[in-house]
Structures are given as structure tokens and as C-alpha cells.
Amino acid sequence: MAKSVIVIGGGFAGVEFVQRLSKKLSSKDVEIKLFEKEGDQTFRTEIHKFACERITLDAIKIPLKRILPSTVKLESAEVKKIDLQNKKVFTDKSYDYDFLVVAVGSDPNFFGIPGMKENALSFWTLEDAQRINDHVKQIFENVKNIKDLNERQKMLTFVVGGGGFTGVELMGELMEWTDKLSKINGVDRKSVKLMIVEALPRILPNIEKTEVVNKAIEYMKKYGVDVRTNSMITNVSADGLTLKSGEFIPTKTLIWSGGVQGCAFTNQLDLKKDKRGRIIVNEYMETSDPNVYAIGDVASYIDKFNKIMPGLVESAMQSADVAANNITVSIKGGEKQALDLKLHGNIIYVGKRYGVANIKSLGTFAGYRAIPMKHLVNMQHMFHVGGFGLVMKYLKDQVF
């Protein structure tokens, strides 16, 4: 009798898992169901472009039916409850499983900063990107009617909290988009203040070479971006934010990209978790329940060298492959596979014409040449997930 495998989450890790498992096992061996209430996969690494209107919604949403193997059944329903003891998943219906794979991703982490959750715009999901888009456009429309200079400046100050990959990529888009919005709305671009606030000694801490990071900072400065490091946010209100130094920065727009934690969905699961709520897994991607696996951002794994699995697409995909292999072994026999991360590096956008690359085979550099390389990486992913058709769609939506 075929074993039942239920996957919750249709992001990078969830889709990679079902694609890999369906290649390893036939429908006689396994019945695979993927639960994703939206019915689409969001190309989340590109949502900063959508937030600032460089690409359309269609460019970052991939219908799951287009990329899932025919042997995988898509359930476009919200999972409301999981009964680990009886191995059941509940939507409006109930489903039995032999193996459960949790791939629900992560949520923003506000680190208990007073007022942050209530007053900042988080930047993590597609819905967040849409809210940011609506908010910034509304600011530029409303400011035309404001005469008070202090109020105008507060409205035209845009702060990104967090100088990691996500925050810098968003600022890269904001600095170009606010140019356009200023012209459209008759606003003096020089009156627009852009700021990155980072608690650590420098932005982009995962980029090895400080001189390369400094080049990116210099590029952003050409657009008037003020990069503040060693600047921890201690309080946020509707009218601004306070730094640990005591400085108050008046603003109506704080966009928070300062960290993530385990998805709140997992709170119901009686599984071992780390201090950020992520599900602890071993090298086989197994949780404290032998029939439950966790992959991607929701998984917390520390290897024998005390290295933490980072929240990157590459690590999500590799964790999915390991889980698929080990569930296959549980069903058919064989040797388990331990996770041995092979990360090739990172490339991030700093606007449309500039990027920062940290690639093992090529080194670390900044400049225009990082952009075509980033497109190549994205197209490689599109081909891997959905074949040549998705590559052509990517070229149409984002290159030509």
C-alpha cells in the first residue's frame, strides 16, 4: 500500500521536496499531497522589485499547478490543525499521513522592540510588499497638501530597519523609485531622506570583504542614502523611531527587515524548537517526531562544526533534497543522507544597475557585472523548477 506524504508549504523548499520525491518513488510507493492555500509559489527573492513597481505581480507568482509533477496532488486549503499523535492534518477535512514535511517558512522577528510590530511596515511576504507599495505612493500623494515643513520632512523620510540582504535590496529599489515618484508628484527629490539603520557594526555582514560593502554604500550615497551602523532601534511610534543613542528620527515610514523567526503556524506543534521558534532537526532533517521532517527556513540545524544552516534558497533546496532522500530510504530501504551544505555564494541587487556578489569560484565584488550574473542564477532556478517555459517568462518579465 502506498505511503502518504503530506507537505505543508509551497515555497522553495516544499516544491523542491515534492519534485525530488516524485522522481525517487512511483505512485505505487507513495501518495504525495502539497498544501498551499494560495495555490501559487511566490518568487520571494524578487519581491523588493514588486514593492517598488519595477516588476508586476505576475512576474513573481508561479501557479503551482504549472510546476508540480502530475503525481503530486495540490490542496489549495488552509491547514488549521495537526494531530501529531494520530498523524492527521486538518483543513475543513482530515487527512492521514505516514510522513509529514513542514515547509512553512518564517515570520518577521520584532525582537520585542516596543512599538515595532504596531508601527513599522514588515517586509517579508508578498502582502507586505503590496502594503509598502500602497503606503509609499499614498505618502507622495498626501505630502503635496502639507504646508508645515517639519511635517513634510517627516513624511518624506523613509527608513529601512536592518542592513542585511533584504534591507539593502529594498533600499536599492526605494532610492530609484522615489526618484520617479518625486517627478510624478512634483516633489523636490532633495527633500526626500532615505536611511538604513543597522544595529551591527556594518551592513551586509555576510559579505566577506568590507571594501566591497563600502563600494555598495558609496553607490547608495549617490542617491542620498544615509547608512547608519551601530544604531540599534529601541522604540518605535507612529511619528518616528528612537535609537539606543537617544536620537529620535521623525518618520512616517519605517520598513522592518531586521530578522526572522519560526513561523507562528508551528506553535501548535509539540516539537523541539530553538529560541526563535524554528523546529530543531538533525542532519537527516528529522524532527523530535520520527515521522515529521522540517525543511527550509522553518528548520533549525547546527552542524558538527557549530555552523547554523542559513535562511537562503540554496540551503532550503538542499535540505529538501536530503528529506526526500531519507523518506525514500524509510519506505524502500537504503542508507540515510546527512545534510552537507554546499553554498556557492550570494548575489544581491542594489537597484537596477548595481549589485554585490560573494561567489566562491569568482570572489567578492561590486558593480554592474553582478546584475547579469544574478539574472543567470534566477534563470537557472526557473529552469530547475519549471523548465524552459519559466525561463522565457523570466526573460520577458524582468530582462527585456
Locate the predicted segments by residue.
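FAD-site-proximal beta/loop scaffold in flavoenzymes
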Residues: E118-L149, G240-T242, F248-Q318
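FAD-binding core/adjacent interface of flavoenzyme oxidoreductases
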Residues: M1-S4, K73-T157, I255
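C-terminal auxiliary extensions adjacent to catalytic cores
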Residues: K352-F400
